[in-house]
């Protein structure tokens, strides 16, 4: 079995139920197959592909907030810091009910390549929550965002991780 196939099988085994992430990794690995196979032993020795497809950090946290009826709601928050080889993590925050760890990993993995093509010294990351801003009041959105950032700020900063807007953030 080739190194590319071994790494893809490892990704699937270590990240079950994350089909979006599997698809992104498969596409990138297939596009690199010819280059990797020409120098397979060197890349294998350096664990290049394993380092490429494994996030440096996966941060999962709860986001409690109070709705307009005074009820406490709890959403899931995520930040995947994928690769900082060329600079601080950079990537958007997505707020949508479909958000889960697999989707954030898929988007963060792709962000590595998008950011590297800018020529700027920034790495790749992505974050978000399964919070749905649709139908929420401005006060509810503010309560959620304040709670989300209160947790996330521990892991971000100009030299560490620079979040940006994405779907559901008004960006």
Regions found by a protein language model. Name each.
Residues 1-171:
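N-terminal ligand-binding/catalytic initiation module
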């Amino acid at each position: 079995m080739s190194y590319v196939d071994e790494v893809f099988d490892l990704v699937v085994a270590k990240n079950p139920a994350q089909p979006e992430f599997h698809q992104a990794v498969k596409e990138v690995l297939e596009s690199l197959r010819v280059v990797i196979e020409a120098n397979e032993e060197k890349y294998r020795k350096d664990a290049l592909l394993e380092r490429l497809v494994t996030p440096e950090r996966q941060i999962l946290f709860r986001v409690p907030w109070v709705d307009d009826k005074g009820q406490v709601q709890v959403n899931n928050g995520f930040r995947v810091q994928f690769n900082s080889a060329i600079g601080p993590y950079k990537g958007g925050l997505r707020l949508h009910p479909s958000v889960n760890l697999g989707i954030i990993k898929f988007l963060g993995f792709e962000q590595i390549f998008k950011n590297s093509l800018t020529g700027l010294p920034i790495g790749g990351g992505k974050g978000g929550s399964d919070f749905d801003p649709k139908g929420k009041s401005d006060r509810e959105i503010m309560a959620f965002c304040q709670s989300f950032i209160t947790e996330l700020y521990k892991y971000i900063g100009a030299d560490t991780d620079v979040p940006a807007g994405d779907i559901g953030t008004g960006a």
